[in-house]
Structures are given as C-alpha cells and as structure tokens.
Amino acid sequence: MLGGDWNHTQGWFEDQWRHWTRAVCEREIPYAYTLGNHDDEAYLSRREIIELDMTNPNSLSSLYYQEFDGASNYVIPVYRSANSNEVVLNLWFFDSMDYKCYGVDGNGCVSRNVLDWFRKTHHQLTVDQKGVKRGLAFMHIPPQEFLVAWDVGS
C-alpha cells in the first residue's frame, strides 16, 4: 500500500511516482494507492493522480466508485491462493480528502456518502462472499474516533 502526500510541481509527481514505484514494478509486486490531503495542491487532480497510478501494470488502484467524494475509494478482495475463489480478506481504501470535514476547516475526513457506500458494499460482499470476511482499511487521515480512542486509552 502506497500512501499519499506526494506534493508536487509541474512534472514532479510523474517523475517521483515512477521513481517510487520502480522497486515494486521490477519485482512485479502488486500494490494499491490511497490519496493524501496534499496530493492535489499543484497541477494534477485527485482523479488524474489515480488514473496515472492505474497505468502501472502492478497497480490495483481503482476509480470504481467515482460518484462519491474523493477518488481513491475502492475495495480489493484477497483470495486464499492464486487458484482459489475463496475470499479471506477485503482491503478497503478510503479517500479522506484534504482540509475540510463536513464544512469545518482542519483535517479532511472520509465523507458520509463514502461511509454509506462502505456499509452497502460490505453488506453485499457478506452475501456474495458467503459470510463476513476480515477487513483492513487504509486512509490518509484517520477518523476522529481513532484520535478520541487514543486520547482516552480505550
């Protein structure tokens, strides 16, 4: 999993992206990318960054769920083996946006419509995958609930 905040100027992002993905490309390691809050501060939009990443044959990044806030909202099923149809884990990727959360300045957050998509998709995957599977979520800015739990120690 590659995280965001590859802040850039004209041409810089593409050069750095090729540099940082070279190691996984040479080893044919699949990876996915989630956006950070600084990624679209220069000349590429969030969508253009994911589209660039998707040109790498080892990238599992996706624009499947474009109707929601952000560009890196998707799920990747992990199978028991290369020859298996049994899903053992779902990797969830959420775009936590940039500097506003529900209109409040500060850190971004995963928007309500993405959370609604997650609930709906998780329910459908539970049916399709014949039961609840473990999951692991990736996002650049953690939900405020994580910070509260950290502060109170529970």
Where do the PLM segments sit?
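Extended hydrophobic secondary-structure segments that form protein cores and membrane-embedded regions
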Residues: 2, 91-94, 134-140
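Active-site-proximal segments of metal-dependent phosphoesterases and phosphodiesterases across multiple
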Residues: 128-154
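N-terminal active-site segment of His-dependent metallophosphoesterases
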Residues: 1-15
